Amino acid sequence: VAIASDIPELLSGISAIATTLRIGATRRMDTFSLADILERMVKRACLALPNAVVGTNDTEGERFASAIVPIAHQIEGLVSEETSQHWEATILVLLRLKAMPGFLAGRLQRHAGDQKLVSELEQEQAFARTLSPGNSHAWVAAWVQGFLGESGLALIYSDELFRTLDTWITGLDPI
């Protein structure tokens, strides 16, 4: 198993190999060996990710988020159903971890909702739990930033998410 500091490179390698497989398939190249390598790399990432993200700082969390989230689309149709399910299960395991940067936690929560790994109700409950008084304002702000990503459309489509965020913001002490 790779050590925690190698995981971003492993994720980057998964992305590169997935791209190569897609290009190779269109050019009718023999990609069997490469597909086997991709399977193994995804499985290795699934094993290593939970330990790798715990205790990372904000910068590393953003780096992990930008590497983890696209992989579901990149490996789609390139790995076995079992490996794909293992990847999805790993995302759900990551959602239950407590000691990771807010941005990464928020981005993973949004990704899980977008991929239908969690229900809309579970998404709303996670949002409400995150914005509860027990979490630091800085961590929550980073979580919301990660959750919203580059788009606040989730707030438009879910009145509950909007109300929860609005209640949290209006409840903050003015500076």
Language-model segment annotations:
Residues 1-175:
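Extended repeat-based interaction scaffolds and adjacent low-complexity, acidic/S/T/P-biased segments
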